[in-house]
């Protein structure tokens, strides 16, 4: 199925020199600690918490509406420590997600309304289905599908997952166009 054009109002997004498109309705706390490596889309009502620890997002990533990206923490006897969050290239995070992972590899798809628990590790080329809740410190192996509450293994992905995710994220970016007056 071919993706149609996704038009947005140019005044509602900030476009950086490296091609990132960030909604003015999103909240980036501690923006000096947030690195978007290029051609990444952050849609309206998203929250990225760079004030807690560094957040690095790779190239050609999409973070859809109302998602929260927050670095993981660990409780110690003397308090709480936050750790950096690394997200790879060509990662697609759907609407209404809460991501509290330690690491998300490249070529990963996170479905709608998911909760990625504290300090989870999502390896390259994996998929989390809609409405999945991953418990804290879950490791999702490459080429697997996780679903349910709690999130458990439910299937495998083909070897071409990397190419498919590159295709999806690049075409989404190319079709995400400013609305021009006719």
From Swiss-Prot:
Q: What is its main location?
A: cytoplasm
What Gene3D superfamilies does the record point to? Hexapeptide repeat proteins
Q: Which UniProt keywords apply?
A: Acetylation, Centromere, Chromosome, Cytoplasm, Cytoskeleton, Kinetochore
Specify whether Cytoplasm is a keyword of the entry: yes
User: Where are the N-acetylmethionine residues found in this chain?
Assistant: 1
One GO cellular component term: kinetochore
Q: Which InterPro entries match?
A: DCTN5, Trimer_LpxA-like_sf
- One Pfam match, given by its short name, reads DCTN5
Record localization? Cytoplasm, Cytoskeleton; Chromosome, Centromere, Kinetochore
Spell out the family assignment given in the record's similarity comment: Belongs to the dynactin subunits 5/6 family. Dynactin subunit 5 subfamily.
Function in brief = Part of the dynactin complex that activates the molecular motor dynein for ultra-processive transport along microtubules.
Assembly and interaction partners: Subunit of dynactin, a multiprotein complex part of a tripartite complex with dynein and a adapter, such as BICDL1, BICD2 or HOOK3. The dynactin complex is built around ACTR1A/ACTB filament and consists of an actin-related filament composed of a shoulder domain, a pointed end and a barbed end. Its length is defined by its flexible shoulder domain. The soulder is composed of 2 DCTN1 subunits, 4 DCTN2 and 2 DCTN3. The 4 DCNT2 (via N-terminus) bind the ACTR1A filament and act as molecular rulers to determine the length. The pointed end is important for binding dynein-dynactin cargo adapters.
Q: What is this protein called?
A: Dynactin subunit 5
Q: Which gene encodes it?
A: DCTN5
């Amino acid at each position: 199925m071919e993706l149609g054009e996704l038009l947005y109002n140019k005044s509602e997004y900030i476009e950086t020199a490296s091609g990132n498109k960030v909604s003015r309705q999103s909240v980036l706390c501690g923006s000096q600690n947030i690195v978007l490596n290029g051609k990444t889309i952050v849609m309206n009502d998203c929250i990225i918490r760079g004030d807690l620890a560094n957040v690095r997002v790779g190239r050609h990533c999409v973070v859809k509406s109302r998602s929260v990206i927050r670095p993981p923490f660990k409780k110690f006897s003397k308090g709480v420590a936050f750790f950096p969050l690394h997200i790879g290239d060509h990662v697609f995070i759907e609407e209404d997600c809460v991501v509290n992972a330690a690491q998300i590899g490249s070529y990963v798809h996170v479905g709608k309304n998911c909760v990625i628990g504290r300090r989870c590790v999502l390896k390259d080329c994996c998929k989390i289905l809609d409405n999945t809740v991953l418990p804290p410190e879950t490791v999702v192996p490459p080429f697997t599908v996780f679903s349910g509450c709690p999130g458990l293994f439910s299937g495998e992905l083909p070897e071409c997952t990397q190419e498919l995710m590159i295709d999806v994220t690049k075409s989404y970016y190319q079709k995400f166009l400013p609305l021009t007056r006719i």
